[in-house]
Regions:
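Positively charged n-region of N-terminal signal peptides that target proteins for export
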Residues: 1-5
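Acyl-CoA-dependent O-acyltransferases
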Residues: 7-10
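Sec/Tat signal peptide C-region and signal peptidase I cleavage site
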Residues: 12-18
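Low-complexity, acidic/polar, glycine-enriched regions of mature
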Residues: 18-158
């Protein structure tokens, strides 16, 4: 079960070193799995009802799914030898909706999503099309990864 989607999951796991980031990835037709990492550097800033973040860096080599073979396939599809990190270059939001720019596998794309601040944590959700990042045709014995994946991330705020 190869999943380049987990690559994106790792990238958007916007958390600090102390928190663990998770991303939900949907497989077709097998169901869902989660990719997790705590190797994320950066944080978000909250001022009133506005939030912002820059240069959130996720080390994709440390993304884990709980299945060693799937982890290896993820590394392959994310091409972590050449692109070891995913980066949220910039993001801003107001009133629970936000936009940003990310880089995965050397490709930069604009994103949009929703968020909420809970205490000292910003929780965000957004969708990505992994084909936009050159991750295509992931399939093993009839089981593939959807091109559209949903990322759920948590980021510490200051």
């Amino acid at each position: 079960m190869k999943f380049a989607a987990a690559t994106l999951v790792l990238f958007f796991s916007l958390t600090s070193m102390a928190q663990e980031a998770t991303v939900d990835v949907t497989l077709n037709p097998m169901g869902d799995f989660k990719g997790k990492t705590s190797d994320v550097k950066g944080n978000a800033t909250v001022k009133g009802d506005e939030v912002s973040a820059t240069n959130i860096v996720v080390n994709l080599k440390n993304l884990k799914t709980g299945v060693e073979l799937r982890d290896k396939h993820t590394q392959k599809y994310l091409d972590t030898g050449k692109f070891p990190e995913a980066v949220l270059l910039s993001a801003k939001g107001k009133g629970g909706k936000g936009t940003g720019r990310i880089r995965i596998r050397g490709v930069e794309k604009d994103i949009s999503g929703t968020y909420k601040v809970e205490g000292k944590t910003l929780k965000a959700q957004f969708d990505l099309n992994i084909a936009d990042f050159g991750i295509k045709d992931i399939n093993y014995m009839g089981v593939g990864v959807e091109d559209k994946i949903t990322l759920n991330v948590s980021v510490p705020v200051k």
